[in-house]
Design a protein with these regions (language model features):
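N-terminal catalytic or cofactor-binding beta/alpha core of small enzyme domains
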Residues: 1-160
Length: 162
């Protein structure tokens, strides 16, 4: 199994903490790319394009800590409540995610335990340990999703003031 997250350590007293729930397009071995083509795995449906590099670059530049999910949102969406139906999507922007269709409760729970919970535990520990003044969840937005209207936003930042 691949790691469910990648931790970047900066100065512990730094007031800024960055994290990326959708920064990776990685589908671990054993999931047969969820039945998708390589082209689909490079599209915005698999990840927030460019955010891993932005998070890494900003963390290095500011010497702050960061956390990056190590799996694609198509495997399990780290930015969803575990009870939500969209936690493991069966479709994304008109594309069927065959490896997620009719997933049984045991397989769903295995993904939660192997990827979702470790990532969120690491996120919670980082926020507790670092006590940042500003946590930024970094996301990117495709200007025109296949089935959507034109977006006029290149980078989205969800701010959590602590």
């Amino acid at each position: 199994m691949s790691e469910p997250f990648h931790r970047i350590l900066g100065r512990p007293e730094h007031p800024l903490f960055l994290f990326g729930d959708h920064a990776s397009k990685h589908i671990p071995d054993g999931f047969d790319n969820l039945g998708l083509s390589g082209d689909d795995l490079t599209r915005h449906i698999a990840w927030d394009i460019g955010t891993e590099g932005e998070i890494s670059g900003l963390a290095k530049r500011f010497d702050c800590s960061a956390l990056i999910a190590g799996f694609s949102r198509l495997l399990i969406d780290a930015n969803r409540d575990p009870e939500m139906k969209t936690l493991i999507p069966e479709t994304s922007d008109g594309t069927s995610i065959y490896g997620n269709v009719n997933l049984d409760a045991d397989a769903r729970q295995q993904r939660i335990e192997a990827y979702y919970r470790p990532y969120h535990a690491a996120l919670g520990q980082a926020l507790d340990r670092l006590t940042p003044k500003l946590s930024i969840s970094v996301h990117s937005f495709t200007p025109k999703p296949d089935l959507g209207a034109q977006r006029h936003l290149d980078l989205g930042l969800s701010l959590i003031h602590i």
